[in-house]
Amino acid sequence: LAIPLPDVVTAELFAAIVQGEINGDAGYQKWADNETDEEVVRLLRLNGREETIHAGRAQKVFELLSAS
């Protein structure tokens, strides 16, 4: 699946990417809250935590690029 990407990623767009990762965690947690299968719940919560980890890495990239 080809997804068109912008030629330039602005600071504003990058901040939105970080926020999207954080929101992704909340979405997975809410989804998990509504499931009854323990393995499904575990996997959804794990995916959510990974979204927060992604957000932290993306934030670090933003900080490094902003410092230069």
Predicted regions and their residues:
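Non-heme di-metal
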Residues: L1-S68
